[in-house]
């Protein structure tokens, strides 16, 4: 399951993201964070961490360096 999620995220990074304006407020980017979280914690916990991160990525949220726990 983790490999499928990572493939979907990589597809987004390579096929969709280049057409959008850069807008992630964090380092690493939300998609990079998602790949690292899923690789490190598995599909369920890593997916939850990635979803929480994406929910925080808005103009009134934080910004800066935010590593995967």
Swiss-Prot record:
The UniProt record lists the keyword Cell inner membrane: yes
Record keywords: Cell inner membrane, Cell membrane, Membrane
UniProt xrefs under InterPro entries: Membr_insert_effic_factor_YidD
Subcellular location: Cell inner membrane
Top-level division of the source organism's lineage: Bacteria
Membrane topology, record value: Peripheral membrane protein
GO (cellular component) term, any one: plasma membrane
Major localization listed first in the record, in broad terms: membrane
Keyword Membrane attached: yes
Signal peptide: none
Function: Could be involved in insertion of integral membrane proteins into the membrane.
HAMAP family hit by this protein: UPF0161_YidD
Sequence similarity: Belongs to the UPF0161 family.
Name used for this protein in its record: Putative membrane protein insertion efficiency factor
Native source organism of the sequence: Chromobacterium violaceum (strain ATCC 12472 / DSM 30191 / JCM 1249 / CCUG 213 / NBRC 12614 / NCIMB 9131 / NCTC 9757 / MK)
